[in-house]
Amino acid sequence: MKLPLLAFFILLLSSGAGAQTVDALGTFTPYSLFGIGEIEKQGSAMNIGMGGIGVAVRNNRFINYLNPASITERDTLSFMMDVGMDIKNFYNKDNDVSSAYNAFNMRNIVITLPIYKKSALILGFVPISNIGYKFASPETDPLIVSKYGDIKYYKYGSGSVNKLFVGGALNIGKKLAVGVELIDYFGTLYKHSDVEFSSDNTIRTIVSGNDYTISAFSAKFGAQFFTPFANDKYLLTLGATYSIGRDLGGDITDYSYATDATGISVDTLYHNVNSNNTIKMPGELAVGFTIKRQNKWMVGMDYTYQAWKSTSFPPVRGVDFEATASHSLKVGVEYTPNMYDVRYYFKRVTYRAGGYYEKSYMKVNGKNLSAYGITLGCSLPISRLNNALNLAVDLGERGSLKDNMVRERYVQFIINVNIHDLWFIKPKYD
């Protein structure tokens, strides 16, 4: 029997309808039950403030790690570092059940260094996906209840997939930049399913789990073509990136054991470690463009495609789930009144806005899961001109109240600290 999707998305110690609140690390969403969890929006507050665009963004003040080719747009003596975090506030509704949760997550740690003339190095850490869910449902079959008593089914999960990367980029001529990243995917995904019996038997709970250890290497290639026009007043940039798809290697540990009323294990039903983890991170293609007036404004658009349909995931009891191709369209704009104004601080602030539409890789109960939203952001100069506090807010919605789905509305706050310093400058005076 198919169950309404996550109809019992509530705290384990609560029951009935009404609003529930949860605090968590990483994420806490029913949709992270599927696949490798909730795919994190990539990019710093600079990118998110503009709807998430970055494929064709070139900026000598901030790090754009969405395209490795972009890091050649920099002062040849500059050291740059970007550290970010985010806070998510999600509000879920499923028929008459409402829930809310807050989650905190490290967003990125990225460093870029000059190498030689118009070439540069980039290295960093970025979360790719997060799992966080916890919900319960009772047994409703009267024959089973009459024989075994009240039974509750619990599902809960946690974990993440992250990437470490190192890359380089260089300019070829005056209008083309190319870059490459070497990527190490790693992490562990924990997915548990428990059955709890209310009868006073030796066995009170059967605990089952699947632990997925992620370990894989991949690569990402990027290019940007940029050319001035209209008497060099404006700059047109075309960008593209491609990430190689890879099996996420590692081990799968399947286990099941029984516990008594005190939680002590009384019997191991099975325990198996399989080194053939076939979960796959598919290839990703992204293209985009920007039109920019230097130090004044920029508009742009990105499109991203990822072929998740070729990836198979373990089934989810009671819910039809399959992976499908994901698409996203993002648009954004930024504006700086006068970045060199010495009298009025807010004229030096960069203001951003954007929007996006995403069709997720999740297809649940025969329906594609989509999300859309608007974003706002700004860069607040700190001390020196290129040091800044970057802020962004993402207001969106995914899912719906139709077809036994969960409607999820969210507000995500992102903060990044950008450090920009000059190295190897010989002082004029000792």
Indicate where each model-derived feature is located.
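Sec/Tat signal peptide C-region and signal peptidase I cleavage site
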Residues: 15-19
